[in-house]
């Protein structure tokens, strides 16, 4: 699997400056999720990878919840750029 197979939606200059920003973290978690998902399509019984995927999904969900509370406009923009569904509300 080639690491650079995913299209970058964040320009290189922004990556260098904002590695700790919520948007960058969500972006990197999304790339990891896509990589693990494609891995699990081939290796269905890789339970450690399934556990890692669930952990990363939870982290991304918490970061997205934080961003939606703090700045709804940036949240909507990020969801649109990364092509992520909005989580269901209870």
Swiss-Prot record:
Annotated localization: Plastid, Chloroplast
MF (Gene Ontology): structural constituent of ribosome
PROSITE patterns: RIBOSOMAL_S15
Record keywords, A-Z: Chloroplast, Plastid, Ribonucleoprotein, Ribosomal protein
Keyword Cytoplasm attributed: no
Biological process, per Gene Ontology: translation
SMART domains: Ribosomal_S15 (SM01387)
Complex formation: Part of the 30S ribosomal subunit.
PANTHER family in the cross-refs: RIBOSOMAL PROTEIN S15, BACTERIAL AND ORGANELLAR, SMALL RIBOSOMAL SUBUNIT PROTEIN US15M
Family: Belongs to the universal ribosomal protein uS15 family.
HAMAP family cross-referenced by the UniProt entry: Ribosomal_uS15_B
Name of the molecule in the record: Small ribosomal subunit protein uS15c
Taxonomy of the source species: Eukaryota, Viridiplantae, Streptophyta, Embryophyta, Tracheophyta
């Amino acid at each position: 699997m080639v690491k650079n197979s995913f299209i970058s939606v964040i320009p290189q200059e922004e990556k260098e400056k904002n590695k700790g920003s919520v948007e960058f973290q969500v972006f990197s978690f999304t790339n990891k999720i896509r990589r693990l998902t494609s891995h699990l399509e081939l290796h269905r019984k890789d339970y450690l990878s399934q556990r890692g995927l669930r952990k990363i999904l939870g982290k991304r969900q918490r970061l997205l919840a934080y961003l939606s509370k703090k700045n709804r406009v940036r949240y909507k923009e990020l969801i649109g750029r990364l092509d992520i569904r909005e989580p269901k509300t209870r």
